[in-house]
Amino acid sequence: MGEEISAIDLVMANDQLVSTSDASDIPYDPYSQFWGKVLVLTFGIICVVFVIFMLHHERIKACRTIISAREQQRTQHSIHRRERSSSGASQQFEHHVRQTDCLPLYEPITALNQQYLKTLPTTSTPPPPAIFDENGEFVGDVPSVAGAIERPPSYESLPAPQNDEV
């Protein structure tokens, strides 16, 4: 038979090539050794524990927020209930005070202002003109003169300041 190369011969030749090749060409694989496996597994476990811890922490924060919102809602409801129950008592107290007290009750200012505004005359005439002195200060009202419009003095009519610098 001629030269037939069997599969076993090829495997043995490959093993010889690998054993004679330079070992520095093969990169270091930490997972190939025992302590490398331990290191990789430890790192993976630490990452998983960290993720679980962060999820648990966020869940606790969410629960606290929900609990505080419920407590706030309960206090608002209890305050509202107290106000409703005390409003009847306060109305009875006000009625009692009205019957026995001599002092008038407070009325809101808005009602007084509306009543006062209704009593005022409504005209579209402007106020009478006024008299001003040289300094622009109010002196008094001008006697009514038909068609005369008095204006305060302008700055142009004031005397110019004198410079005493020599």
From Swiss-Prot:
GO cellular component, one term: fungal-type vacuole
Keywords for this protein: Membrane, Transmembrane, Transmembrane helix, Vacuole
Region annotation Disordered: where it falls in the sequence: 73-93, 123-166
Membrane topology recorded in Swiss-Prot or TrEMBL: Single-pass membrane protein
Keyword Transcription: no
Top-rank lineage group of the source organism: Eukaryota
Transmembrane segments: 34-54
Protein location: Vacuole membrane
UniProt entry tagged with the keyword Manganese: no
The protein's name: Uncharacterized protein C630.04c
